[in-house]
């Protein structure tokens, strides 16, 4: 496919992102759509751009991303994790900077399951004294 392409897998909640990085001019393509088309919310776009802005490579690399599962926030987090891993494969010296910002660690928080006899994961049914 490409001569010098770097890959990273990112996960968050129930989303999984595959990120390919190539030298270029800062184009970000997510599921064959631009970043602006894919994410309507500015916060999600900001989360995706964070690792690139941290290491000053916004205009130096092109990103090709496929993401599946979850919602907007989970997908944005998965993409950020994938970009971080791909950047570390591209240049290992960026690891400490990315680690300090907290992008390397996989956010392990998952939705807690609903339990039998409860209304939600922890919410109990209303108690009636009489």
Swiss-Prot record:
Keywords: Ribonucleoprotein, Ribosomal protein
A Pfam entry, by short name: Ribosomal_S9
Cellular component GO terms, alphabetical: cytosolic small ribosomal subunit
NCBIfam families referenced in this protein's UniProt entry, alphabetically: PRK00132.1
Similarity comment text for this entry: Belongs to the universal ribosomal protein uS9 family.
HAMAP family in alphabetical order: Ribosomal_uS9_B
The protein's name: Small ribosomal subunit protein uS9
UniProt gene name: rpsI
């Amino acid at each position: 496919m490409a001569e010098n392409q770097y890959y990273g897998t990112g996960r968050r909640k129930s989303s999984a992102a595959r990120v390919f990085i190539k030298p270029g001019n800062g184009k970000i393509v997510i599921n064959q759509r631009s970043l602006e088309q894919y994410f309507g919310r500015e916060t999600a776009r900001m989360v995706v751009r964070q690792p690139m802005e941290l290491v000053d490579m916004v205009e130096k690399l092109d990103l090709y991303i496929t993401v599946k599962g979850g919602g907007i926030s989970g997908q944005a987090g998965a993409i950020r994790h994938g970009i971080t891993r791909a950047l570390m494969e591209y240049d290992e010296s960026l690891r400490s900077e990315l680690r300090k910002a907290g992008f390397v660690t996989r956010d392990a928080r998952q939705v807690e399951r609903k339990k039998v006899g409860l209304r939600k994961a922890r919410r109990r049914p209303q108690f009636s004294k009489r």
